[in-house]
């Protein structure tokens, strides 16, 4: 009995996770670990693409460092093998959800071309060393099949880097170097096949002083290949068929390479210009407009300086257009991370709901003011409030010179004018002149945007009005009597509105009752009309009466029976 109980307990307990499952978790293809592993795979792939072909074409390089090459070869093979293990533990997206089932991941991977290429790149071709010797690195050319991992790593880096255009240029230069490197190796191998020093085109005889060194051999071949592929010329003419074929192939490669380089560089420059146009407004159109309208030189200079300040200091005025392609929630998170700290410093917005602040940051409009420019003047109607992000603003007198105070970064003004506070003695008018001392970056929040957001947060609106009232009390800008009068007027208006609503409800009820009575009367009238029509159809026509008189009276019993049946049937009722 105890044994059975023990067996059942063992079967019902869940299996313990294996160590392999803990050590090899499923990687997210868009995560950091997978990204850094791709960057690690760049080294063995680049090693094989650059060093392997060089060892195959330069025997001195292969023979001089054989032990080092064998160590590096099998280290790269180990990384190739680990890369396949990583591929078996890299999830994939299915309907937007990351699949972490290792069985499904493995079955999906083995059905792709990547699996066969990875497997072919690890074929143990080195076993032929037993027959041909270790100085035949061409047996390892199948390692080139892992090159797609290099391209994938470059694509991921281009997406993540903060300087994508610079990375594209660096990647293009790397491709150019690899092509010239391969071509120089093939040139040296062809020269050795044809015979060193046989003519002016091939590599000189290594027996000559200075040409026997490995460094000289590679640099000469690289220089010769650069001259050919850049179509600079100044190279000895070919003398044999093999040399002609090599030159023709290089010229065709140079034409395609030149077109590729020009296209890539044009694309990079165009993308840079497009990005600048998206971030900063186009000043050429404004300059042309000012010239056509004969704007005075001083004002034109101020406009040009404003545009120059934006571009030099990387200021942006159209953040909404830049982030318009992001989903709404993601755009809100970006705006919150950038502007929430600034908005939370405003006194009337403190202790407000986080969701309210997230809605407000989407409404902030960045503005840049140049030196001496007025942000607002006394007596202007206040339709927005301002938050100082960077720079200094002065509260000046009407003469524009006398300064009463200086506002710095993090301060704000105009917040009272966008909140309808009862008893506000200044109303929605500006009470001071605000002028920018230098270039100032501000955030603008309009009354309409605030009203739109607060319509969904009535409690927050009440809290903000209370805070604004406290601020006005401290500033002695609140008329308590006027506030009480406005409150009484509002209550009276609301009472009248409630009365009108009640009267409207009563009228609607009476109208519905009258409409029902009208429909009932119409139904009764229709029934009576239908009954009259039925009765008129039963009456005999005058011609029928005359014929009946000529033929004689009908039998008395029959006539009475028919009249009785007609009176009993009656007219048909309404359907």
UniProtKB/Swiss-Prot annotation:
Pfam families xrefs: CLZ (PF16526), cNMP_binding (PF00027), Ion_trans (PF00520)
Subcellular location: Cell projection, Cilium membrane
Central gate, annotated site positions: 258
Ranges where the record places region Disordered: 538-575
Ranges of compositional bias, category Basic and acidic residues: 557-566
Intervals of motif IQ-type: 292-302
One term of GO molecular function: intracellularly cAMP-activated cation channel activity
Segments for region (Cyclic nucleotide-binding domain): 354-474
Binding-site residues for 3',5'-cyclic GMP, renumbered to this chain: 414, 417, 430-431
Annotated transmembrane regions: 39-60, 71-91, 117-135, 141-159, 167-190, 214-248, 249-273
InterPro entries the record matches: CLZ_dom (IPR032406), CNG_cation_channel (IPR050866), cNMP-bd_CS (IPR018488), cNMP-bd_dom (IPR000595), cNMP-bd_dom_sf (IPR018490), Ion_trans_dom (IPR005821), RmlC-like_jellyroll (IPR014710)
Gene Ontology BP, a term: calcium ion transport
Listed Acidic residues bias regions: 544-556
Extracellular compartment segments: 61-70, 136-140, 191-213
Keywords: Calcium, Calcium channel, Calcium transport, cAMP, cAMP-binding, Cell membrane, Cell projection, cGMP, cGMP-binding, Coiled coil, Ion channel, Ion transport, Ligand-gated ion channel, Membrane, Nucleotide-binding, Olfaction, Sensory transduction, Transmembrane, Transmembrane helix, Transport
Sites where the protein binds 3',5'-cyclic AMP: 430-431
Predominant place of localization: membrane
Protein activity control: Ca(2+)-calmodulin exerts its inhibitory effect in cAMP sensitivity by binding to IQ-like motif of CNGA4 and preferably binds to the channel in the closed state. Inhibition by PIP3 of the CNG channel probably occurs via CGNA2 binding.
Region described as C-linker: 274-350
Annotated stretches, region: Ion conduction pathway: 164-272
Domain notes: The C-terminal coiled-coil domain mediates trimerization of CNGA subunits.
Quaternary structure (record): The olfactory cyclic nucleotide-gated channel is an heterotetramer composed of CNGA2, CNGA4 and CNGB1b subunits with 2:1:1 stoichiometry.
Record function comment: Pore-forming subunit of the olfactory cyclic nucleotide-gated channel. Operates in the cilia of olfactory sensory neurons where chemical stimulation of the odorant is converted to an electrical signal. Mediates odorant-induced cAMP-dependent Ca(2+) influx triggering neuron depolarization. The rise of intracellular Ca(2+) levels potentiates the olfactory response by activating Ca(2+)-dependent Cl(-) channels, but it also serves as a negative feedback signal to desensitize the channel for rapid adaptation to odorants.
Family: Belongs to the cyclic nucleotide-gated cation channel (TC 1.A.1.5) family. CNGA4 subfamily.
UniProt protein name: Cyclic nucleotide-gated channel alpha-4
Source organism: Homo sapiens (Human)
Taxonomic lineage of the native organism: Eukaryota, Metazoa, Chordata, Craniata, Vertebrata
Gene: CNGA4
